[in-house]
């Protein structure tokens, strides 16, 4: 609060990024327009938009690191600034001074809130409640009637807390008038004369679920669409389309330059879209992906449900030379996390319906088009020293039903030393397939769901066939029993030998229909140059 007050008085024009805001390449971007004091509400908005904020009066030992060190102090400063603006007469500063004197060289039983309440009484009862509030806040305003110079606006409180609400009224000459609505809880209609625009919570003293509904005018506000290179912060008065140049590659499409178009900003919003068109230099065709996502965060933090996500996605690329594929995959994902936000425990329950349409070749393929209903459960708990992951997968198709579980454990038992263990168990409950296209793979990723970035997905030999994806059997070596159409049990492990050099081993039990159980074994050296991104076996 004191820093906000100091900057406001002595450096009101200080930009958040200082002199860099004047650089020609960024001077028109939203973040270059932010003042120094805007950082407090920006960081608060970023965390609140992810549904991981915590009440200001939470005990320190219950706060996450980011909330303890950054967000809650920022929110506290903004809250005191709102009280100071609402009450006036420098009441906050006087209470801070009194509290400092009472605690000079001695320890007093009185908290700052005790002193503040003593000096202001019931005028700040709402403030005490705000410190404890742990839910979404959202106010909105819209015009409901306009007769000559008399206009009526409806202000709605879409949350369950009573707060004083600051509003700014502007006329045609852009002259502004500010007033407060005291203890705002229920919906309110206000009459405005000779003003043509109203803004609620103009200083953004508290984070809201949606700031775009904080503006209204006697005339319909026409938002312009702006194309913005790279991501930026949201401008509530414009529709922004962010675009980023992209370059992708696979063996059949060649180099694919393109663009990624999205509405994603650092402050998350409920609905996000991403279009990624690209041009195949090898096929001379326009390809790409489209993804739509709607996130509904659970405002009730007394249960473990964190969010519900709705996805719709589609893509088109080539799986062989001159043979294209198209996918369509709607899904619902339920995300769970511990009520103790400091816990790293996460759970995900998802349901996907994947439709694949493959261009047929002259030799014909048994499954050019197919649909799979996929259920997945993931439980993970990771820390700096240890990482645990459990995944259960269940797939249903008209010709097969298969289920699998995967267990991963990684332990950094010393500096730059680790060991890891992975167990995979997969079983066909029903299998009427004609070939091994949907079978469990012992050493190659069978990406018939087209969800993995394989550079040469149809290659059986050569450099591109050696791309390793840790799935199913998880073997790095090519073995005689490539597939399992009944069940497979695979155990893989590794341990650090020296710095980024590791030894690995694996053993697998592979069972095919009408064949005896077969055991396979492997061992070798892993060059762990960049974990999970660049490794050589």
Regions found by a protein language model. Name each.
Residues 489-497, 504-507, 523-531:
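Conserved C-terminal beta-signal and adjacent last beta-strands/turns
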Residues 1-157, 162, 172-177:
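Hydrophobic alpha-helical and helix-loop surface patches within well-folded domains
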Residues 12, 309-320, 327-333, 359, ...:
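C-terminal outer-membrane beta-barrel translocator/porin domains of Gram-negative envelope proteins
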Residues 455, 516-537:
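C-terminal beta-signal and terminal closure region of outer-membrane beta-barrel proteins
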Residues 177, 181-183, 239-251, 257-259, ...:
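Transmembrane beta-strand segments that form the barrel wall of outer-membrane beta-barrel proteins
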Residues 164, 168-188:
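Solvent-exposed beta-strand/loop surfaces of large extracellular or lumenal domains
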Residues 182, 188-194, 199-304, 333-335, ...:
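Outer-membrane beta-barrel initiation region
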